[in-house]
């Protein structure tokens, strides 16, 4: 029945690679082929069927192995192809560059040959030199001598395909390729040598030319500069040639080293490749062993299945003639018996080891006892020795010196540590301050960044809304254009009216200047006529502060009449006060906006009424007859002077108050102007028109009030002035006043025309407003939205400015912190200098310490001398110990011989017991010749094995997981309950969870 298995085993050798066949055949000769059990067979058909099944199974295994081998071979083929491709590529590259090198060398040789032919024609035959040293020139590079050794397939031109070179390499053998490459190498060497010879020849020729030039220069009169230049060039040429030769030598040496390193690299690569091949071989062997292991595992699994199914025993003698058991069963029995024997042997060995361990522990204890006794010697014995006393004295001296040195060292270390700690504390304090400031700066910067991000978001939202509003406003573009055109026309008309008003203002200023001149002339006339001048001064100076302040002038006190002042001083003060009154009135008229001029004109009218009343009251008092007495006139002059001074001070106060009011009104006008700018354009135009109208009306009212005042003044002055010169001047003033009145009439007519035009334009504007009401409403809404957006944008810009200012402040703070850090760094440098000084002092202390250590070494030498005496005593002790050691080996040898004899005795006893068991088995086999009896005996043995060794009645159904010995569950539980918790065989302790029930089928 073992025929198919023999065929399979013989065929297994062909599945491996060819290089492994010999070793595989050698290995297969040593393997044992087990017989194949087919079981009970009733007919030949059943036998053929089982044989075919077995063959199919083996073929399937072989097929799997073959597929695995094919996969591995494919991988190796791919690797080899890749390697071959890389090798071909490198060969092609080497061939191409080698061919290029040969071509360049040939070109250089041609150039040198052509130059040599041209130069050799004029030269003498004696000066020519051959290319070689022996006079036999090498053939030309184009001749056949250099090209014959090289075949054309190894030196293809660049135009030929690279495949020809690879095909030629594949067609030729290794010896041919080596010969061809050697010839090509010789050609390259010869060409390079010729190039070198040509370069040497050129160099020699250059040297000859230089010598000729030098000799010719010596014979012919040349300039010293040319000679020096030629010598310098010659030296430079020689230096460059030497440098070139040195560089060539260096390059040659480096190239040789590089080639050596390349050879080493290639050798290392070859070693790596060899190692890879060995690794692949080992992997192949491992794979083969793995496959063999798989086969054995399959066989073992089949055997276990057959054992579990009870297929391995046949109860009748029909299957096997003579009732014999199978070979595997016999092996199994033998293995079990050997296992039992080995277990017993291991137990005996374990007992021996435990015994030896106990003996070793006893020996260690006995060895430790004298050591402990030596360690625990009484102190009195040690103190009584002379060596101890001598060492104690030396130790006391050395100890005192070491204490002194130690105190000094501790002091130095303490000082150093104190300085270091103070330095570190200062640095930590500085670092903590710096960290705190950095944290504050970071938090402030983060807050500013957050606010900036919020402002940017708001700005983006406003911009988006503004763009939306612009897009909405573009729809009403044509209507807005028409309205703007109409408004621009009205604005142009208003600008014309404003220009006329400005022109009238200038005329009014000129009139006021002329009136001031007249007042000055009138005051001059009062100086010439003293009896009439005082009433004029009082009449001129009194209304000025009344006009500015809007109330009656202050009444002079009785004490003021006693003081005297010159008359010209009073006139000058009155004229200066009037000029100051005129200047702020003009500035107020120019500075006020159109919206604020209406109330100011009303205030002026209200101020003009009390002025008139004051003048009417003062008129009788200031116009006394010229026949008054001189005393009363002098008192009156004093009172006038004092009153003029007081009025000047009050006038200054009033001017300051008016300046404050003007500033406040200017702020209000700025606010109104901002509101006016942010208001819609139609409202702005309407406000401009109304403001211009109010302004014109206010100017007209002011001019009328001034004309009335001037008329009243003229009337009072006509009563006061009696002199002819004054009358003449008054007439001139009246003529000017009439002229101004005529101008005023013309301005009134122009004003009425302007007012009528304003009414017409206002009516047209109202009509247009009624027509475009709805559109204006929409525009107002859009303008309101734009106004809101603009206000929000202004707020955002203000916030942005504030944030920028805060950022600048933070930058200044950062600069301050940097300056603080620099100052702290300076302090750190100072501390480091102090530390260096302390380190220098520490170095001095260390020097002292070295001196002390030298003294300590002297004392140590003394101690060594004392130790030598002790060693002499030790030598005597060692003599005694050597005798003891000589005796101890004899004792150890005798003990070892005795132990060896006991060990051999035990081994002999074990061998005797093992041989006895074999003898008993052999006797059993001889006694029970019949197979049935053998089977019955084996069954009894198996039953005895399956019974519990403790009670010998129940079957084994419990296992101890500590040692895996099997007993019956009742015995194990009884021992556990009786607290005998150790294995009956090996005395291994077990617990409640260490025994389990098993079921043997």
Curated annotation (Swiss-Prot):
Keywords: Acetylation, Chromatin regulator, Coiled coil, Isopeptide bond, Metal-binding, Nucleus, Phosphoprotein, Transferase, Ubl conjugation, Ubl conjugation pathway, Zinc, Zinc-finger. It is found in: Nucleus. The modification Phosphoserine is found at residues 42, 528, 585. The modification N6-acetyllysine is found at residues 20, 355, 517. Residues 522-531 have a biased composition (Polar residues). This is E3 ubiquitin-protein ligase BRE1B. Transmembrane segments: none annotated. It catalyses: S-ubiquitinyl-[E2 ubiquitin-conjugating enzyme]-L-cysteine + [acceptor protein]-L-lysine = [E2 ubiquitin-conjugating enzyme]-L-cysteine + N(6)-ubiquitinyl-[acceptor protein]-L-lysine. Residues 18-28, 602-619, 633-646 have a biased composition (Basic and acidic residues). A zinc finger (RING-type) spans 948-987. It comes from the Eukaryota. SMART domains: RING. There is a cross-link at residues 578-579 (Glycyl lysine isopeptide (Lys-Gly) (interchain with G-Cter in SUMO2)). Pathway: Protein modification; protein ubiquitination. Residues 1-39, 116-153, 519-646 are annotated as: Disordered. One of its GO terms (molecular function) is ubiquitin protein ligase activity. Component of the RNF20/40 E3 ubiquitin-protein ligase complex that mediates monoubiquitination of 'Lys-120' of histone H2B (H2BK120ub1). H2BK120ub1 gives a specific tag for epigenetic transcriptional activation and is also prerequisite for histone H3 'Lys-4' and 'Lys-79' methylation (H3K4me and H3K79me, respectively). It thereby plays a central role in histone code and gene regulation. The RNF20/40 complex forms a H2B ubiquitin ligase complex in cooperation with the E2 enzyme UBE2A or UBE2B; reports about the cooperation with UBE2E1/UBCH are contradictory. The keyword Coiled coil applies. Its EC number is 2.3.2.27. It comes from Pongo abelii. GO terms for biological process: chromatin organization; positive regulation of transcription by RNA polymerase II; protein ubiquitination. One of its GO terms (cellular component) is ubiquitin ligase complex. Residues 44-91, 189-369, 437-518, 627-946 form a coiled coil. Component of the RNF20/40 complex (also known as BRE1 complex) probably composed of 2 copies of RNF20/BRE1A and 2 copies of RNF40/BRE1B. Interacts with UBE2E1/UBCH6. Interacts with RB1 and WAC. Belongs to the BRE1 family.
């Amino acid at each position: 029945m073992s025929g198919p298995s023999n065929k399979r085993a013989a065929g297994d050798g062909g599945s491996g690679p060819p290089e492994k066949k010999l070793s595989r055949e050698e290995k297969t000769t040593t393997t044992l082929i087990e017989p194949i059990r087919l079981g009970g067979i009733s007919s030949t058909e059943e036998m053929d069927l089982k044989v075919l099944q077995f063959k199919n199974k083996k073929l399937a295994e072989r097929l799997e192995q073959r597929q695995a081998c094919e996969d591995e071979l494919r991988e190796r083929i791919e690797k080899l192809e890749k390697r071959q491709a890389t090798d071909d590529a490198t060969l092609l590259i080497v061939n191409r560059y080698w061919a290029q090198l040969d071509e360049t060398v040939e070109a250089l040789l041609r150039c040198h040959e052509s130059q040599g032919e041209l130069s050799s024609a004029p030269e003498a035959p004696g000066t020519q030199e051959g290319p070689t040293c022996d006079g036999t020139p090498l053939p030309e590079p184009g001749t056949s001598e250099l090209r014959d050794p090289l075949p054309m397939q190894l030196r293809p031109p660049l135009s030929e395909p690279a495949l020809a070179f690879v095909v030629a390499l594949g067609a030729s053998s290794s010896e041919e390729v080596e010969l061809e490459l050697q010839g090509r190498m010789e050609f390259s060497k010869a060409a390079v040598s010729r190039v070198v010879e040509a370069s040497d020849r050129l160099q020699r020729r250059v040297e000859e030319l230089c010598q000729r030039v030098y000799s010719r220069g010596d014979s012919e009169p040349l300039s010293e500069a040319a000679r020096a230049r030629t010598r310098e060039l010659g030296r430079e040429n020689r230096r460059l040639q030497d440098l070139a030769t040195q560089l060539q030598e260096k390059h040659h040496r480096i190239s040789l080293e590089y080639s050596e390193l390349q050879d080493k690299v290639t050798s290392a690569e070859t070693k790596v490749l060899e190692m890879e091949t060995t690794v692949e071989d080992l992997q192949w062997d491992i794979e083969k062993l793995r496959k063999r292991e798989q086969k054995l595992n399959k066989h073992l699994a089949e055997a276990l299945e057959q054992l579990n199914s009870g297929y391995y025993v046949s109860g009748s003698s029909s299957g096997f003639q003579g009732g014999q058991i199978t070979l595997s069963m016999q092996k199994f029995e033998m293995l079990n018996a050997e296992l039992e024997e080995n277990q017993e042997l291991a137990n005996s060995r374990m007992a021996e080891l435990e015994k030896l361990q106990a003996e070793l522990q006893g020996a260690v204890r006995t060895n430790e006892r004298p050591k402990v006794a030596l360690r625990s010697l009484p102190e009195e014995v040690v103190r009584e020795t002379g060596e101890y006393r001598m060492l104690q004295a030396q130790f006391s001296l050395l100890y005192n010196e070491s204490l002194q040195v130690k105190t000094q060292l501790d002091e130095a270390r303490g000082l150093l540590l104190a300085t270091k700690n103070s330095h570190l504390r200062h640095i930590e304090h500085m670092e903590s301050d710096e960290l705190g400031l950095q944290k504050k700066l970071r938090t402030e910067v983060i807050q500013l960044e957050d606010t900036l991000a919020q402002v940017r978001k708001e700005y983006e939202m406003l911009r988006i809304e503004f763009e939306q509003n612009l897009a909405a406003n573009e729809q009403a573009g044509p209507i807005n254009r028409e309205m703007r055109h109409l408004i621009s026309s009205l604005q142009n008309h208003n600008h014309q009216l404003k220009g006329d008003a400005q022109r009238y203002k200038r005329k009014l200023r000129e009139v006021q200047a002329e009136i001031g001149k007249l007042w000055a002339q009138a005051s001059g006339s009062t100086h010439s006529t003293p009896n009439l001048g005082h009433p004029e001064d009082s009449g001129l100076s009194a209304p000025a502060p009344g006009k500015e302040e809007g109330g009656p002038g202050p009444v002079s006190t009785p004490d003021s009449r006693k003081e005297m002042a010159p008359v010209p001083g009073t006139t000058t003060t009155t004229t200066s006060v009037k000029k100051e009154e005129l200047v702020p009135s003009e500035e107020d008229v120019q500075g006020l906006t159109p919206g604020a001029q209406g109330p100011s004109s009303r205030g002026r009218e209200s101020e003009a009424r009390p002025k008139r009343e004051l003048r009417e009251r003062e008129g009788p008092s200031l116009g006394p007859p010229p026949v008054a007495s001189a005393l009363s006139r002098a008192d009156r002059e004093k009172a006038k002077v004092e009153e003029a001074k007081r009025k000047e001070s009050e006038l200054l106060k009033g001017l300051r108050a008016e300046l404050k009011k003007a500033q406040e009104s200017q702020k209000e006008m700025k606010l109104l102007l901002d509101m006016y700018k942010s208001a819609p354009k139609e409202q702005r135009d309407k406000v401009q028109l109304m403001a211009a109208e109010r302004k014109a009306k206010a100017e007209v009212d002011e001019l009328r009030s001034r004309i009335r005042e001037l008329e009243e003044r003229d009337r009072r002055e006509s009563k006061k002035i009696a002199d002819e010169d004054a009358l003449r001047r008054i007439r001139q003033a009246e003529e000017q006043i009439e002229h101004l009145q005529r101008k005023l009439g013309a301005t009134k007519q122009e004003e009425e025309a302007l007012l009528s035009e304003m009414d017409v334009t206002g009516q047209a504007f109202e009509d247009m407003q009624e027509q475009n009401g709805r559109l204006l409403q929409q525009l107002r809404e859009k303008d309101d939205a734009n106004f809101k957006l603009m206000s929000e944008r202004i707020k955002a810009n203000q916030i942005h400015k504030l944030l920028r200012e805060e950022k600048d402040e933070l930058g200044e703070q950062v600069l301050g912190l940097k300056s603080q850090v620099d100052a702290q760094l300076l302090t750190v440098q100072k501390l480091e200098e102090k530390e260096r000084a302390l380190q220098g002092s520490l170095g001095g202390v260390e020097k002292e310490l070295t001196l002390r250590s030298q003294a300590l070494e002297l004392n140590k030498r003394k101690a060594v001398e004392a130790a030598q005496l002790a060693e002499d005593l030790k030598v005597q002790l060692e003599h005694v110990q050597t005798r003891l050691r000589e005796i101890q080996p004899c004792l150890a040898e005798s003990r070892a011989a005795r132990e060896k004899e006991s060990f051999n005795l035990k081994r002999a006893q074990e061998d005797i017991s093992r041989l006895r068991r074999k003898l008993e088995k052999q006797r059993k086999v001889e006694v029970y010749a019949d197979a049935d009896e053998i089977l019955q005996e084996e069954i009894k043995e198996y039953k005895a094995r399956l019974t519990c060794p403790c009670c010998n009645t129940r079957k084994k159904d419990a296992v101890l997981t500590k040692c895996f010995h099997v007993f019956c569950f009742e015995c194990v539980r009884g021992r556990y309950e009786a607290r005998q918790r150790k294995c009956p065989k090996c005395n291994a302790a077990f617990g409640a969870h260490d025994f389990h029930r098993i079921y043997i089928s």
